[in-house]
């Protein structure tokens, strides 16, 4: 007992008692379900318990509309109902895997109108024992039931290629698709940011669906371990949402203005799904030995480049030391400001760091900043600086890109299942309708590095067959523009670029060919031909006089004159370009040869948009409403800007506008870009569709099927496939015929396709270069030293072929 503020009958609180009181005062915060799920210390059992609870809380409202089918008899009955309804939406669930070759089909989601959303469990398992649960269907059951779907039933999917591949790889059944709502959405508006099922359903059907989003609950938890009835609440709605999207899209495509777009969807974009599905599953052989040799070759080049960079940096040694000791360097090193933290110049300098490279260029070497005023270290800026160290840095980046993106990356993508590379091709990857690809990006392998493409090969007894559309885009342009000079060049079998050059330079056709009548090189003709080719391709790709001038190493004025002379010789082409731009300004889009639309909303922008920094609001006392007050000054200012006669007058008006509390958005750059895109979108989109039509025809050609030909890779205007060696001549013939045939109806100039066979991709081009080097005096020994990606035997064969 002691006397204290607590009274004489109580002891003072002891130290441990104080701690206890603090705990009572500040109880420990209760973790949320999300925090527990994301904690590395939470057991799988506890995570599953939380998931089961949260799913029922959030999605329990869907329980009356959800059904789990656990027997084959029930599934047969449901499909019979779908046969009567003439439509069935299908979606797959896998064991958290996106690789069709290795994943398990965990469940199937289906929906037909008037019925409940159905989930069919297939491979759910006990989380503790990994043992497959009872009362589920097998993959064989699924295959047999899907085979009962009538031919007149429309099968709907979202991202159908993936679901088709999963079903085919796990059940061996090839399920057709009639409507892919992902592709349907893309054709209706390629400018949308997201084409995933949930985003499309939210944006087009039900904006409240976000409150039911529970995707994050399953992080790091295998779907297979989730209770079947619980998981059904999450998964079964996918097929229903796919069907509702189909209903929405069907109404859109039925509109009169979408007639051509619907035809493109049905005749090209849907049939190509089957082609790409099979092509991806086929895969392509990768020559790993060549990849190793290429890796060694380019790593040696990279090491040599690093050595030369160090030699070049040594020239700046005194400047670097001086800067390190300067107050500026000390300030950057000590600063804790986020913008400057980490700007220390390390020893040696890390040139892969854009920050350190900027210090070297702009602080130490005192080079002038680009026009933007930013300390940029991009490729364009480094080229303009024109310093040996900058050239070496670009060279180093090039080697690192080749190694990291292609040479070392491609062999890593080879599947362990069959030892082949299975690229992924995406129909919604490019807004013009071209395919994009990944794992790896076969559409973007540098054309100047032929040896990288030679990694793509075939198995023993097979050969690659390749065919490309010769001058595909210029031929389409000639047909669409109806330019007689271009059309006649193709009809007469002449070299288009030599014909164009003869018009531009006002001389004879023969004077503009690369070779004269005796087969000798014609340097002047080659130069003129190259110049007009740059102009034509510049028009196709939306490039201006600046870009063309840089490519041809001439002034902007000279490039401008060349472009003007070009259009004088081909006035119909200029008229057609103007017509495309005018159509886009009126409608907000352009349309390619087969109806694909490229929406260019920027072309309809005002050149200048003047706006007040503060909104002016007007109150209506009679109606009790308020709205934004119309500002007449805005119209006046925009009129002045649009009619300014020169740059100085424009600057004066701009100053007046800003002094009165207004601001200006200059949209001229966006408008110009959209105008340039008009031509590119129409021509590139038409070419993309032509290539897809060719792929469909080749894929469905029974002659090629009997010969064992399979498509492997499409690259813009080129199709690559493989076949048994003994069938190569017929395969080349039929492949070229099919490609030419698809354009006959819609293009008024004949397409030309050159088909060839080779042991690996680009072997023919590479072999020709080797032969040319040998012919020009390079010895076999020197060729072996230079081209280490090839064996001596390969090089010997190339020389004598």
Enumerate the predicted regions with their spans:
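C-terminal structured "cap/appendage" subdomains that terminate the fold
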Residues: 702-757
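Conserved "right-hand" nucleotidyltransferase catalytic core of DNA-directed polymerases
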Residues: 2-128, 192, 203-205, 209, ...
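Short active-site loop/helix that positions an aromatic residue
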Residues: 96-98, 108, 161-173, 185-188, ...
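Nucleic-acid-processing active sites and adjacent nucleic-acid-binding tracks
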Residues: 113-155, 284
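Conserved beta-strand -> loop -> alpha-helix junction used to position metal-binding or nucleic-acid-contacting
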Residues: 173-190, 197-199, 354, 493-497
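Active-site palm subdomain of RNA-directed nucleic acid polymerases
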Residues: 254-268, 272, 690-715, 719
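Acidic beta-strand-to-loop metal/phosphate-binding motif
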Residues: 89, 153-160, 464-466
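Conserved catalytic core of nucleic-acid polymerases
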Residues: 224, 281, 415-418, 422-423, ...
